[in-house]
Amino acid sequence: MKKILDWYNWIKFNWLRKVQLVDIDYVDVSKDPVRPNLDLKFRTSYGRKIYGLKYENEIVGVICVAYTNDIPTTEKELDLMSKVSYYEKNSNTAIAYTVWSHKKGAGKKIMEEAKKFLKGKADRIVTLSPLTPMATHYHIRNGAKLINLNPTTQNFEYKL
């Protein structure tokens, strides 16, 4: 029975071997389950980036990253810190402030690919996550460590 399950899982998730992380300049922000209030201009200005997990010709996962030199606890701090770091050219921390996927397995894979991509570009990768059980479980399952519990958010850190 174990061999059958192993084979089934291999077939079911084999597509993950064929994905790549790409820099994208457009995403339908209304599909963002975490921060749909942040418009496209916010996500692509002041050095902020949108990365997509591409499988064949489809984006199956999205991660939005801002570059700062400190750890924000609110969206306002994220905005201000990323602007300051952009102008001073001194960012050392990648802040993943939203992650979502359209295909099972893509959420975990996009974080793995983002960590590989950001290694050497940032000293650390930290999240600005909502205070929800889903966000907590996602980050803990993917190997992150809770470093701050804030009034409206939480920060997790991933090892690069």
Report the location of each language-model feature.
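Conserved N-terminal entry element of GNAT/NAT acetyltransferase domains
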Residues: 1-25
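Conserved GNAT-fold acetyl-CoA-binding loop/helix
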Residues: 18-38
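A short helix-loop-beta-strand connector motif used in the catalytic cores of GNAT acetyltransferases and
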Residues: 40-61, 66-73
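Conserved acyl-donor/pantetheine-binding loop and adjacent beta-alpha core of acyl/acetyltransferases
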Residues: 64-95
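Conserved GNAT acetyl-CoA-binding A-motif
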Residues: 94, 119-131
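Conserved beta-strand-loop-alpha-helix junction that forms the acyl-donor binding cleft
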Residues: 101, 126-137, 150-153
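Conserved acetyl-CoA-binding loop-helix of GNAT-fold acetyltransferases
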Residues: 101-118
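Conserved catalytic-core motifs of GNAT/GCN5-like acyltransferases
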Residues: 145-158
